[in-house]
Amino acid sequence: MATYKPKNILITGAAGFIASHVANRLVRSYPDYKIVVLDKLDYCSNLKNLNPSKSSPNFKFVKGDIASADLVNYLLITEEIDTIMHFAAQTHVDNSFGNSFEFTKNNIYGTHVLLEACKVTGQIRRFIHVSTDEVYGETDEDASVGNHEASQLLPTNPYSATKAGAEMLVMAYGRSYGLPVITTRGNNVYGPNQFPEKLIPKFILLAMNGKPLPIHGDGSNVRSYLYCEDVAEAFEVVLHKGEVNHVYNIGTTRERRVIDVANDISKLFGIDPDSTIQYVENRPFNDQRYFLDDQKLKKLGWCERTNWEEGLRKTMEWYTENPEWWGDVSGALLPHPRMLMMPGDRHSDGSDEHKNADGNQTFTVVTPTKAGCSGDKRSLKFLIYGKTGWLGGLLGKLCEKQGIPYEYGKGRLEDRASLIADIRSIKPSHVFNAAGLTGRPNVDWCESHKTETIRVNVAGTLTLADVCRENDLLMMNFATGCIFEYDAAHPEGSGIGFKEEDKPNFTGSFYSKTKAMVEELLREFDNVCTLRVRMPISSDLNNPRNFITKISRYNKVVNIPNSMTILDELLPISIEMAKRNLRGIWNFTNPGVVSHNEILEMYKSYIEPDFKWSNFNLEEQAKVIVAPRSNNEMDGAKLSKEFPEMLSIKDSLIKYVFEPNKRT
């Protein structure tokens, strides 16, 4: 196996816990490498973490944000960076529930900025993306084999969902642009320098001050812990020996219950566990277990060197010698911290009076009055985004027809302040999001405009969802079903459709990747109704966005059955769904499938008797398009149960499209 040797390494988030240990190790061990570290210095970063490297001639610190494209491009070019180790991220699960959008900005958008800079400069020989074991989701309690690197990603919280989303972007840039990427997924790390929002430093600081150790629930939750220096060595191995386009778990199969960790720390301080452990209310999002398979990395020569007892002792000694390293962290030491300490500000989750752990200082946080309230009896008024789009325009016409007051939003989806201004001025009962980038003339546009696509389809949609959540507003979100493709479990012609709970399996186009990513993240919002639209069709056969109009103008057509959405029938249903306060994910297609040839046969029979077309296969189609297209059948049972009067796709085509346009 060839050993990779970098020259100039950029380490993001390097003033944080794990990255600082990696940076210090590389600076110390490889004086011929230039190490440039970038960090915006938020609440869990500390320049003192990099003290061992400050005087080294091969070390350079830059304060800045990875979301700044100009800064990132400047650094890559001026420092002649050939290797990136991307650690920068928001990582605390609890905080992700209180301010998930901040996690999207940091973990997804920031990663995308980095990737785009790599593509533009064209000089990166290794991009190591640091992810988490939490992307695999919760492991069964009785599982004897850990998640291996090819396991399905099933994140269960906003933090892990954003990390999984970032991984998808990294994979996309590896495949689309040949960027030499490597991804790591690590389990819990402990040791010196860690901000005490995490379990072990939190327990150590509490024990040092004679405070109770709070256990969420019964303490049976299981975690695997690696000492920080062992993890730093793992990254050293991945840097030099890791294979491009591979994923490596950094973990251990040795597991410990939270109650066992509390017992061990109590014993280190000579405290009776029975008197110091305090059982508190469990967190509703406290996964029971994460378990990794660690064999792949071991084959590169890495192994865990520090046993639990030694690592815990070293960690305790460091915190007792450096009790003021992080300053006043009393807010983080509470059993259920109310403070969400995100960069730039401190956020509270309610209007209340709180006390620091020592009981001395108090402060009051006041939550502003919500612009909307789901429990009131206001009449309907819709706020619609997507005025210039096809669906947005049709929604406005439907509102006029039904006598429903509505206004179009003036704000841009990615501009939070403008969305808040819209809601305050319009005071809607519901918000409809029909805005988004699909590309003109088709989704191939998104392949060359990825930053714009993610800004609107991911960051923008999540911003609107979060603003609506803060104002107790239901958001009707027009999404896409083009995130699936026929597979072994859902073969073409079988009648087995993809259900609402199924995870996307189509990543052929960047457009679909962004839509799959945002759908996964929106699962965490209980105020969103996601409508999976597919190949939309309307009675307006002159509209270039109409699927029938599109295929009738193609020189050749692939004949394959698909689920589709007849807008004349289903858009009124979306309004009724808003009235019924329906939420969650819905396959927003007419029941059944129709092939492209069947549609064109109807077109010929009803509209243009002399119409002719020819077919070609998917392989031939691939030669004339940039990105592959999604073909699938969606399961319509959920929507049909709610609206049993809904017509099948073929009957709806005839009633709403071809009969009204029939030429005599």
Curated annotation (Swiss-Prot):
Pathway: Carbohydrate biosynthesis
Source species, domain of life: Eukaryota
Pfam families in alphabetical order: GDP_Man_Dehyd (PF16363), RmlD_sub_bind (PF04321)
Residues that bind substrate: T132
Signal peptide per UniProt: none
Tissue: Expressed in roots, stems, seedlings, and siliques. Lower expression in inflorescence tips, and leaves.
Molecular function, one GO term: dTDP-glucose 4,6-dehydratase activity
Binding site for NAD(+): G13, A14, A15, G16, F17, I18, A19
PANTHER family xref list: DTDP-D-GLUCOSE 4,6-DEHYDRATASE-RELATED
Family membership noted in the UniProt record: In the N-terminal section; belongs to the NAD(P)-dependent epimerase/dehydratase family. dTDP-glucose dehydratase subfamily.
Written domain comment of the UniProt record: The dehydratase activity is contained in the N-terminal region while the epimerase and reductase activities are in the C-terminal region.
Protein name: Trifunctional UDP-glucose 4,6-dehydratase/UDP-4-keto-6-deoxy-D-glucose 3,5-epimerase/UDP-4-keto-L-rhamnose-reductase RHM3
